[in-house]
Structures are given as C-alpha cells and as structure tokens.
Amino acid sequence: MTSKIKSSNTLLTFDANEVTNIKLVWDIEELKNKDKEDKAHIKDEEEDEDGPVSFHPSFSHQIFNDEQVQGYEACKIDIYMGAGSLTSYIDTNYTLQSKNLTNVEGELLKVFSKQDPPISKQSFYKFIEEKEKSFKPIGKKIHEYTITDKESGEETEYEVYFGRITDQAVFRYHEKLQIFVLWYIDGSSYIWTDDPNWDIFFIFEKRIIDGEKRYGITGYSTIYNFYHHPEQTRARISQYLILPPYQRMGHGKYLFNSIHQYYKTNDGFYGPVYDVTIEDPADDFNLLRNYVDLKNIIDEKLFDNVILDLNANNKSVFEEIRKKLLVPHKQSKVCLEIYLFSKFLATPNSNPKYKEFRIAIKKRLYKQNIGDSEQIEKMKQQVAQENEDNLRLEQEELQELQDIENKKNGTNIKVAINTKELTTPSEPEKSKEEIEKDRLEEIIQLYKDLEENYHKTLSSLNLITK
C-alpha cells in the first residue's frame, strides 16, 4: 500500500462504517488534487471541492462481522470508483499480508464484481485518465430532467435509462453497482441475476468536462416481473437506492415516476403491466410513494368522484386509478386515507364523521398488525406442540427398543428419558384485559406515527401549512 501507518502491540477495534470512504471519481484531476492533499496531510472531512466526492457507508455488517475491523494499526479503507464506469481500486493497509486480524481487502473482494474486480492504483489512475471519459450510460434512455441548486441556481441534467438483466451490458454493470445495496439498504442481499425476470432502471448525472459529455451514476432500482393472469405482468420494485451525494434533491420522485411511465407504455416480461407494487417498503420509501401517488391522483382528478368515506365502496375509482397510473387498489386506499385526513384537519375531534374516520383507520391497523401477531403466536404454539409430540414419540420408540433388549438379556433397564421442559415465562402470564390494553396502546402509537407521516405527505403537496 502507498501509505505507512504506525503500528502498535495493542489490539484496536474500529467502526467499519466510519473508517471506510467511498470516492466517486470523474476526472484524473480529482485524483491529482487528492494526492496533493495526502502529501499535505489533509483529512477526508477537510477535503475541498477539487477532490473526488467522498462518503461513508451506512451499513457494513454483511461484509465485516459486527461492522468492526480489528488490528494493530490505524485503519484506512479508501474505495475509489469511476463515477460512471464503477471501475474500482481499494486502498487499505489491512491486507492479507499485514498482521492485522481483519483482512479488509479479502473481505471486500468477496462482495465486489467477479467479472470486473478492483484493480491496482496504477491501473486505476491510467483508466480514469484514458477511459473514464468514454463511459456511456447502460440501457435505453427513457427520460431526462433538470434539477436546480437552490443556493447557486446552477442547473444539472440527469438521464434515466432502462435495461433488462438478460442484456449482458446491463448484467455486467449491475454486478459492479450492486455492492451499494449492502452499504445502504439494511438487510439487503444481491438479487439472483440468472433469473431473466429482472428489469433495472438507472439514473445518471450528465456533466460537461473539457467540452465533453461525462456521465456518473446517481441511483437505480431493480424490478421483478411476476406473472399476472391472463398474460399480464405485475412489476414489483425490489431495491431502490439514490446514492448519498444525491439524496434529498428530488431524484427519488423522478425515478419513481419514470418507472411507472415506462410500464404504462411498454410491456413487462409476461405482457402489459397490470400494476406496480413494492417489496417490503421502508418508512422513508412509503413517504416518497405516498407523495408521488397522491400527487398523480390529484393531478389526474381521479379523486373527484370518490366517496369521502373509508367504509364506502370505491372499487370503481380504485380500478380507474390502477388502469391510468398502475397504482394497486391497496395503495389507492392509503392515498384516500391521506386525502380524507386533509379534509378533517380543521375539524374538531368530537365531529362524528372525523371520529368514524379515526376508528376506521385504527381498525385497519389492528387487523394489519395485531391480527398478524395473533396468527404468528398461534403458529408458534402449533410448532411447540409438534416438537413436544415428536420428542415424546421418539422417547416411546426408544423405550420400546430397550424393552426388547431387556427381554433378550433378562434385565429390566429403563431408558433415561431426556425430557425437554417447556420454557416457562419469566414474568407472570398477562390477563386478557392486560393483553388487550397493550394492543390498544400499540394501535394508538401506530396511529400517531401514521398521522405524522400523513402530515409530512400533505405538507409536501402544499395541501396544509408546514
């Protein structure tokens, strides 16, 4: 490695997220400026705008145990990647040859692209200088948009591209890109790319450097195509990520709308797309989804004929929304909840209609959350009973075999039964009243959280004052 860091005899432990720096490099000048900073001993957090964009991962537990790196010297992990090509170079002093306990380089190589693994520093510098500028976005361009910086007024152009995993260029590029989901989506895993049902949408930033167009990755989403009878496709968003330097800028809504717009006019794997669903969305993604879906519904005036009652039959309205916007019925109901909530904001809590509205939502939350937990508890009890029955059966069979041996030998030996006692709760069992009270408190908290999220969505849509 190029840097020399003083070692000690004391075992040190480092937070893997804090010591890892991911750097997106657009141009060789950024690397030259970085080298000057290194010589001047300037720390990463003191970098000026002339160096590469640098940021830390949010998660690393799928790469390093407990998100920790252990060794006998200060840990350095700098991961350089071409902003567009994602060609990479790992600069770390925790290698297989070092005496440190964690082989950082080895662990990272396990999760990086196998077709395009990290290269040496010399090769990386040469690639950035000679080839990075020739990188072109992968797939088919389907949309473009401009974002204006609120402070400087500077406009930046972005382009959205679509590709299928069966396209070898898309497959290979995704293999280099997918490491970001381990760093930024908790509990994520790599998709099974041998399955042809995967679609991928990419966002690229466009810059002009030395009079030439340059492109850098901004974010992406993976979509799985499910079969929907008859001869239709149900598109499910699986992974959805905007890279840290581009977050809180509005890219999420542009990508979300681009996905829906594409599938409205293009077939999925099995035929026309029936709707677009989400796989296990996080809270932040739900906020984005609710904002975009409700805005589109209002812009298309699709709630103009809706019955303002959660208990009413609005199936025909929801079906029209699905056909025009590819929003599933269930999500349309959520949007209706938010829309109705805006109508009751200036209404006293004692208002009968508002009271009915709150009760209807709490009933849904109860069924959605408590109902599921009751089912899980029943399943746990069934499994425990099955295990107990199986254990008893094994013990009986064992005793029968021993009885046969006893008769042969004229002895009377009893098998030492290895009974497995059921674990008793450490606390006294709660009464039905106490259990129900806990459940109601849970629902009340869920409702409060829901109200807060609905407020955020309505504020974003300027339907209420922040």
From Swiss-Prot:
Per the record, the GO terms for biological process are: subtelomeric heterochromatin formation
Q: What is its EC number?
A: 2.3.1.48
Residue ranges that the Swiss-Prot or TrEMBL entry lists as coiled coil: 372-459
**Residues carrying the site annotation Interaction with histone H4 N-terminus:** W198
Query: What are the protein's UniProt keywords?
Result: Acyltransferase, Coiled coil, Transferase
Please tell me one Gene Ontology term that the record gives under cellular component.
nucleus
Q: Superkingdom, according to UniProt?
A: Eukaryota
Q: Which residues form the N-acetyltransferase domain?
A: 169-366
Q: Which residues bind acetyl-CoA?
A: Y240, L241, I242, Q247, R248, M249, G250, H251, G252, K253
Report the leader peptide range. none
Output this protein's name: Histone acetyltransferase type B catalytic subunit DDB_G0275159
Q: What organism is the protein native to? A: Dictyostelium discoideum
